Amino acid sequence: GSIFVHSDYRVSYLLRQVLNEIFGEENFVNEIIWTYQRPAAPNQQFFSRVHDTIFWFKKSNNYKFYPDQIRVPHDKKTLDNFKKGLKGSGFGDTDLNVGGKIPEDWWLIAPAYKSTKETLKYPTQKPEKLLERIILATTEENDIVADFFCGSGTTLAVAEKLNRKWIGSDLGKFA
């Protein structure tokens, strides 16, 4: 099994230490940077904060990862530089157009802003695309997805759409 824990800049450095103690540093898989765009205040005196962190830990070496479910297209420059049959590229017999690539550890995914059709106006709502990538990458149909801070319920809704069983709970009354 896997656990994904989301945080922002205020606690991510502390959270990683706590997660290492709980799950073991040897069970750390990835630190994923979820980046997004939003307008900056015209008078701000610092760089715009436009990313959050998602830590991925595994329960054991028998965790699941399905990269073919989440592949994304290569950019044009990569396709031009690493053409099939190009000697010395390391990709001589590989057609990069087939299937795409496994995403890097930074994901540019738009947040669920108030103006988007999926918003429920819950302050910490995550976009469906973000949760879909995580669920597709690490579960199969009929697997269980749990969200113990489910808030807006987006994780559970995406799990349902992807034919996963789900468990959700939250301390907030809105949830």
Question: What do the PLM-derived regions correspond to, one by one?
Answer:
Residues 1-175:
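Core catalytic lobe of class I
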